């Protein structure tokens, strides 16, 4: 890619690299985000309790090989009911 033709993606990547350099952390060039990177991002910004709940949820989600729409619907409803019960207890 020629200079001066940065896409928003490369600009945001450069910004991230500059921030990392400024804070003294190791600099790395980011690639397009995949599910693991997005997960890492959310885990960094969430509270520890919320983070634990989300880790459990993502592990279950990623363990599904070929989910049907109905099986997903059932799973989500079960998780929602369980989550609401825990909220009321806490």
Curated annotation (Swiss-Prot):
GO biological process: symbiont-mediated perturbation of host apoptosis; symbiont-mediated suppression of host cytoplasmic pattern recognition receptor signaling pathway via inhibition of MAVS activity
InterPro entries registered for this protein in UniProt: Flu_proapoptotic_PB1-F2 (IPR021045)
Region (Disordered): 1-34
Site label Low pathogenicity, positions: 66
One cellular component (GO) term of this entry: host cell mitochondrial inner membrane
Ranges where the record places region Mitochondrial targeting sequence: 65-87
Family (UniProt): Belongs to the influenza viruses PB1-F2 family.
Misc. remarks from the entry: Is not encoded in all strains, and seems to be dispensable for replication.
Protein known as: Protein PB1-F2
